[in-house]
């Protein structure tokens, strides 16, 4: 499989992971018991965020710079809406230390309604994010394979840190220096 094909597959998987995240929040807002720890709170630790910051940003220097900037902003916006939901449903109802031991209180009807309002805003941002992802995918499909090889380090070409360290170590008897002075 080529670098380009692998990247497109990962792009689609990242989009799917984002949709799963939104659906988990939908369950939470609907009042259904959900393991809150399964919903990432940190944008850079979500599966989508990991893909965005670790892989997609390699193309931030090419013609996709503006689209990636929009995707990044929309991703942050989605998490801002989720933080509002989290604060409304989770942190307010955790009950402090004893609440963690005894279980959390159920959110009130007004808290659920407020969370649903925040969820509607989240869905709007998420839809815009998915649309920008489709634009980015179209740009990637139109990008030549050579550009992928240039910008994305293929897994089989990944640098082995041990081998790299061995290659950068001086060979033979080379005088070591510290602050310009020879070291014995």
Where do the model's predicted regions map?
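N-terminal membrane-sensor/transducer module of prokaryotic signaling receptors
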Residues: 1-184
